[in-house]
Amino acid sequence: MAKKSVSVIAAKTAVHAAVLAPIALLGWQFWQVWQQGSDALGADPVAEIEHRTGLWALRLLLITLAITPLRQLTGQAVLIRFRRMLGLYAFFYASVHLTAYLWLDLRGFWTQIFEEIVKRPYITVGFTAWLLLVPLAITSTQGWMRRLKRNWGRLHMLIYPIGLLAVLHFWWLVKSDIREPALYAGILALLLGWRVWKRLSARRTTARHSAPPPATPR
């Protein structure tokens, strides 16, 4: 049991390091651009920062959604221990993505965000996805699970429309080559399709078990 706990701690440490590596690299490159005027972030550093943080937010969201199917396929219940962590990191990257847009793109004129939301559909869906993530991040603790009881599960089903909105945000943002957003859309469709199939299978199994036995002839 102790060995298993050590393994989980080691795995969580590795996940923390892997997930924080992209933002650490981005921070270092931003510092180089800011202090030395280097081209570490390409010709458009602001666009590069927004792209990378948004992409990692989407990736981590999809990885979070993949935890349940992976647990069901492998039988490894320990995978559930990583779901909350990955979901919070998805929110973290989404928040950095939004902050970069407000601070670097709008240059602090944050009131413009409301004009942008009205004018640009991809910003509308992206901002909506972030807003929906906020209550999920706040209520991700054990304390909130106890307070909300069954409503906790209902609330956290928002992760599904959030995934759809995030993919749509990326799809509308890309102007020409849609191969990358199409790939993420396909992954999301697979993850949601798996859940639908499992739910329908469970209903059929329940219906078979609850059906009355056939009448025996007299």
UniProtKB/Swiss-Prot annotation:
It is a multi-pass membrane protein. Its cofactor is FMN; heme b. It is found in: Cell inner membrane. Belongs to the MsrQ family. Keywords: Cell inner membrane, Cell membrane, Electron transport, Flavoprotein, FMN, Heme, Iron, Membrane, Metal-binding, Transmembrane, Transmembrane helix, Transport. It comes from the Bacteria. Heterodimer of a catalytic subunit (MsrP) and a heme-binding subunit (MsrQ). It comes from Xanthomonas campestris pv. campestris (strain ATCC 33913 / DSM 3586 / NCPPB 528 / LMG 568 / P 25). One of its GO terms (biological process) is protein repair. Signal peptide: none annotated. One of its GO terms (molecular function) is metal ion binding. The chain crosses the membrane at residues 14-34, 60-80, 86-106, 121-141, 155-175. InterPro entries: Fe3_Rdtase_TM_dom, MsrQ-like. Binds 1 FMN per subunit. Binds 1 heme b (iron(II)-protoporphyrin IX) group per subunit. GO terms for cellular component: plasma membrane. Part of the MsrPQ system that repairs oxidized periplasmic proteins containing methionine sulfoxide residues (Met-O), using respiratory chain electrons. Thus protects these proteins from oxidative-stress damage caused by reactive species of oxygen and chlorine generated by the host defense mechanisms. MsrPQ is essential for the maintenance of envelope integrity under bleach stress, rescuing a wide series of structurally unrelated periplasmic proteins from methionine oxidation. This is Protein-methionine-sulfoxide reductase heme-binding subunit MsrQ.
